[in-house]
Amino acid sequence: MNAPIDITNVILKTDRLTLRPWRESDLHDFYAYASVDGVGQMAGWLPHADLEESRRILTHFIDGKHTFALEYRGKVIGSLGVEEYREALYPELAALQGRSIGYVLSKTYWGQGLMPEAVKAVTQWLFNNAHLDFIFVGHFDWNNQSRRVIEKCGFRYLRSTTYETRYGTVETTMDYVLYHPERSKPHADT
């Protein structure tokens, strides 16, 4: 089942990043990467058309209390959300606590190992502090950058599903799971 998550007072530090709740003052940094063609499409959304669109989504991030801002050298360069997963697809996990993560990173910072660093910090926090039993993540079948992040972070392939994006396309997603390392898995094939 989807576990409750609230990151209101959570700040995670890695060697290069600070992961923290979003602030209204992050608006221009957010728009700077979210308006770039090719960034949002990797996660299923179109580039932001204007600052007001970014403001609306930023307000959603702040109010939702489950999306980290990724700060690098004083600038927000991406986000990592701890989202609800589609429980109906995984009835075998109904007795366990879990969530799904999703992430996006400014094109300027692709290929530098920053996203695996962020994902590892958040998964560790989710297991140790939010007491999750498992975490899902997925990528579109054509998104090799996300696949590499997922593999580097130790997730195991689970299955393929279809997903309707916010811009109306239907994509095949490759779904992965990471179980809490000190808890037993529901059964051997997942």
Q: What is the meaning of each model-derived region?
A:
Residues 1-40, 67, 71-190:
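Acyl-donor (CoA/ACP) binding surface of acyl/acetyltransferases
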Residues 38-58:
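Conserved GNAT-fold acetyl-CoA-binding loop/helix
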